[in-house]
Amino acid sequence: MEVEEEVSRWEGYADWRNRAAVKGRHGGMLAASFVLVVEILENLAYLANASNLVLYLREYMHMSPSKSANDVTNFMGTAFLLALLGGFLSDAFFSTFQIFLISASIEFLGLIILTIQARTPSLMPPSCDSPTCEEVSGSKAAMLFVGLYLVALGVGGIKGSLASHGAEQFDESTPKGRKQRSTFFNYFVFCLACGALVAVTFVVWLEDNKGWEWGFGVSTIAIFVSILIFLSGSRFYRNKIPCGSPLTTILKVLLAASVKCCSSGSSSNAVASMSVSPSNHCVSKGKKEVESQGELEKPRQEEALPPRAQLTNSLKVLNGAADEKPVHRLLECTVQQVEDVKIVLKMLPIFACTIMLNCCLAQLSTFSVQQAASMNTKIGSLKIPPASLPIFPVVFIMILAPIYDHLIIPFARKATKTETGVTHLQRIGVGLVLSILAMAVAALVEIKRKGVAKDSGLLDSKETLPVTFLWIALQYLFLGSADLFTLAGLLEYFFTEAPSSMRSLATSLSWASLAMGYYLSSVIVSIVNSITGSSGNTPWLRGKSINRYKLDYFYWLMCVLSAANFLHYLFWAMRYKYRSTGSRS
């Protein structure tokens, strides 16, 4: 009887009370559905402010267009980069369940600070209608940035844990579980879009018509409700027990390999037969932790032996780390640890190739919003706030995600006779191609917008240009589609390909790519202004009015860089070999 009860338990997983997770009671689509609802509210809370933040900084904090754009990209970049911290802590010391609760509480605190500042005139710079206004400074600026970066810290932790927490609910040892997990990632992006839809319509309307205290207030309520909903699903979750620092494993293998290369000893005495998978160590560790709680009275009588790991020929320079006689016992590495580090290193070029796409996405939150603000934003008698422009890609994602999951993927599975239908890397590649097209469209639209401004004699005027903002929607549609293909593909790619002890950290690379894209955008803007502003010339992206910017040149540059990046991606993608079940084409 005890053996049957043991078999029904999820190895390496515990419930929220640190008791053994039980099959049929914990995990599955029901548990993951709580995560999907939470993602709607979490992204609503974040994007409601991020999408419109450039206008808040410019009009209420009186920052220049270029400074406000850079501050927004730095804020969003920091938020996504901190996902690495959330992913690391989820793998090493805490569960994804715990990291979400801690991070959501931090974001909640940051939003409270921003709400208080927005509703208190004495905490903001004086209102001003002239072209030159007093920029926020001193304690007021400190309060602004403390609030913003507390939000960034909270968002980072959530991004680094929530998607992994949902994906952990599925049994990857069965085809059904893997298909459900793939569906989860598609609908995770769908729910992200649902939250964005409310954010860029209702909340942005509140910010523009009722005041920013209303916008921050709604975000505060949304993140608070998300915590309550997440907690309500606690009894259904299976929580992966942390296995120790994945960075320690990576650094140990790299250091051991370096020492071996520098020594005169041969690496031929590495033995595979003595090594076992870190994930199995993790399971053993998890079982000991649960047993210490008195939940597991006896270990399994007949434990299946893990498959023996074998050194592969790829990245052979690391094979020396699996030496049976290391220089120091602290540098002792198993063969499986060496192979796990190889997997992570092989994924890094794919990760790097997605940064440029996210650099293009950064333009949606900065220059594109400012372009739309100069155009006619009326549709009939309805006036659309410029920050609501993302509604176009958001709605497209909400339409395309179910079609992709229920029509395209089943057809692709039948056509290719594979479990995935479309491989993760193929999906990412489609997104990269769409980003190239988006930048070309953006350049053509900007040529038209500036032509209207010149013909109307409004190059230096703040008056609305007689051209509809729907032209800007074209680039949003292309970039929105690119985001759907790339983000969902990246999340699933990193989760399925990464070693089980490093999955949260690996999945957070999807968000770190976004972060580096935003930072790269700031760097490119600075470099472009520095080069084009030399010899007394006017920089491309600086001037009294955005109508004087050479944004069309900038977008063409982004198009060329994106095309070069795609060729770089093809080089690595065509040489990549999948390791996980269900990922092979």
From Swiss-Prot:
Q: Name one GO molecular function term.
A: abscisic acid transmembrane transporter activity
Where, by tissue, is this protein expressed? Expressed in root hairs and in epidermis of both root tips and mature regions of roots. Detected in shoots, stems, flowers, siliques and imbibed seeds. Expressed in vascular tissues in cotyledons, trus leaves, hypocotyls, roots and inflorescence stems.
Signal peptide range in chain numbering: none
Its GO biological process annotations read: abscisic acid transport; nitrate assimilation; regulation of stomatal movement; response to nematode
Concerning what turns on (or off) its expression, the entry says: Not regulated by nitrate. Down-regulated upon nematode infection.
- Quote the cellular component terms of the Gene Ontology held in the record: plasma membrane
Gene3D superfamilies, A to Z: MFS general substrate transporter like domains
Q: Which domain of life is it from?
A: Eukaryota
- Compartment(s) where it occurs, according to its Swiss-Prot or TrEMBL record: Cell membrane
What InterPro entries does the annotation carry? Answer: MFS_trans_sf (IPR036259), POT_fam (IPR000109)
Upon gene disruption, the observed phenotype is: Reduced effect of ABA on seed germination and postgermination growth and increased number of open stomata.
The entry's keywords: Cell membrane, Membrane, Nitrate assimilation, Symport, Transmembrane, Transmembrane helix, Transport
**Which Pfam families does the entry mention?**
PTR2
Main location (coarse class): membrane
Which family does the UniProt entry place this protein in?
Belongs to the major facilitator superfamily. Proton-dependent oligopeptide transporter (POT/PTR) (TC 2.A.17) family.
Q: What does this protein do?
A: Low-affinity proton-dependent nitrate transporter. Involved in constitutive nitrate uptake. Not involved in histidine or dipeptides transport. Involved in (+)-abscisic acid (ABA) transport, but not in gibberellin, indole-3-acetic acid or jasmonic acid import. Mediates cellular ABA uptake. Nitrate does not compete with abscisic acid as a substrate of NPF4.6.
Descriptive protein name: Protein NRT1/ PTR FAMILY 4.6
* Species whose genome carries this gene: Arabidopsis thaliana
The organism's taxonomic lineage, starting at the top = Eukaryota, Viridiplantae, Streptophyta, Embryophyta, Tracheophyta
